[in-house]
Amino acid sequence: MKKNEAFTLIELVICIGIILLLLSIGGLNFKIRDRVQAREQVKELALDLKFLKNYSQINNIRTSMKLSDEGYSINFGHNTKTVKFNSLVNLESTNLEKITFSNKGKPSYLEEKSSAGTINFSVVNKKYKITIQPVTGKVNFIEIKE
């Protein structure tokens, strides 16, 4: 009689369980990575605003940023940078669509609209606020604790 070599049912169930466990850990890492990436994008927006302010002061030219629900684009000198938001980044409210800094680094008034104001974001269940102060143009990034 020939003896057949094969896996037992218990061995197969254990192997499938281990594989499923490893796959679920990988799925959790992707969710965490997306949250971190979304938060970093909001921080990058605040840093880009600070960069625009400083660039306009140093080079004595106007700089601007256009903000939308999908992302933003900045114009400085002859250069343009466009950033598309992560799907987790949600622009909740803002009184700014276009932000312009004068050649002295101050928020300018174009078409009777101020470039100073507040931008509110949410990433999953966390909220962030970016403020631009009216006279000085100082940019603040605040994580709102609930």
Regions found by a protein language model. Give the residues of each.
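A generic structural signal for short
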Residues: 7, 40-41
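N-terminal single-pass transmembrane signal-anchor helix
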Residues: 1-30
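N-terminal helix-rich module
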Residues: 21, 25-35, 39, 47, ...
